[in-house]
Amino acid sequence: MSHVDDGFRSLTLKRFPQTDDVNPLLAWEAADEYLLQQLDETEIRGPVLILNDTFGALSCALAEHSPYSIGDSYLSELGTRENLRHNGIAESSVTFLNSTADYPQAPGVVLIKVPKTLALLEQQLRALRKVVTAQTRIIAGAKARDIHTSTLELFEKVLGPTTTTLAWKKARLINCTFSHPQLADAPQTLSWKLEDTGWTIHNHANVFSRTGLDIGARFFMQHLPENLDGEIVDLGCGNGVIGLSLLAKNPQANVVFVDESPMAVDSSRLNVETNLPEAFERCEFMINNALSGVEPFRFNAVFCNPPFHQKHALTDNIAWEMFHHARRCLKINGELYIVANRHLDYFHKLKKIFGNCATIATNNKFVILKAVKQGHRR
């Protein structure tokens, strides 16, 4: 938990999920403060759009202006809602929209936290292009090291004239004025053929490894089990290639695709529809914080390629939460399979949670682990 006085109001903010007290990560950064410093409240005429507000620092500070919080992270929405409540601000003050939704017309102010991927930034800038005017104040912010020439060129190409500020507390801002430059249309998804399958994999802008199969998933797919039945989960599904493979290998199983990214879940749904339409009725698609709210003892198996970062921050909190949720939701003798970089040492974490862990396969970079939910552990 951390305190910030941004000039609009004094706030107490926390990350979601919370980090441990030994290695705490802040729920806000200098770029949030810098954005708010540059914003004169007298300029706010018309809707306020906030993009990629990781834990609600901007939304909480500007709550009295009824902002729209736009992004592709259910975790960020949950974190923002929790911080609104914690600071005594009505959740209804903020309207939450997915990045692929229609944005409000003629906004007075647009604040953008520059996302990690240029593809997501381009998708969002193209969406803004349809609604902003020459009078819209457009300001983006990030750590100075995360603003590159390619970032500025993208703003110029999609929206118009772009300038940057001096660095402050290692943060930098981008100011942009909409001038309606000529711009060719772009497809909503990026597609590629998955070798040895005949499948075409479709990827929305914010999907991990959207330009091709990542090497961890490739290794995982080589060792997925067969002859499973009942309900199984592709947890943190991304574009759904693991779940697709499980559907093909296990015709008696139903697969639940889960991710905190709406774009990932939409990509998974599209990939089942286009590649295995006959298996679509065996699928469920869920935008969720891991398996929050899912009943215990439901699944026969969970498959997971856990992230070790949240936006720009390195953290194993999300993976840790995924493992605990998986154990709670597995049936007795249900199995959790994960693939991970070897250096993360998830073997001992799983053994601590499940009381057991076995190595299924390993190579010079990745390891595939299996843990079984045993009846004698609660």
UniProtKB/Swiss-Prot annotation:
Entry-linked InterPro entries: DNA_methylase_N6_adenine_CS (IPR002052), rRNA_m2G-MeTrfase_RlmG (IPR017237), RsmC/RlmG (IPR046977), SAM-dependent_MTases_sf (IPR029063), Small_mtfrase_dom (IPR007848)
Gene: rlmG
EC number: 2.1.1.174
Signal peptide (UniProt feature, chain positions): none
Catalysis performed (reactions): guanosine(1835) in 23S rRNA + S-adenosyl-L-methionine = N(2)-methylguanosine(1835) in 23S rRNA + S-adenosyl-L-homocysteine + H(+)
Annotated keywords: Cytoplasm, Methyltransferase, rRNA processing, S-adenosyl-L-methionine, Transferase
Pfam families given in the database record: MTS (PF05175)
Function description: Specifically methylates the guanine in position 1835 (m2G1835) of 23S rRNA.
Gene Ontology CC terms, in alphabetical order: cytoplasm
Localization per record: Cytoplasm
GO MF: 23S rRNA (guanine(1835)-N(2))-methyltransferase activity; nucleic acid binding
Official protein name in the record: Ribosomal RNA large subunit methyltransferase G
Family: Belongs to the methyltransferase superfamily. RlmG family.
Domain of life according to the entry: Bacteria
Cytoplasm among keywords: yes
Lineage: Bacteria, Pseudomonadati, Pseudomonadota, Gammaproteobacteria, Enterobacterales
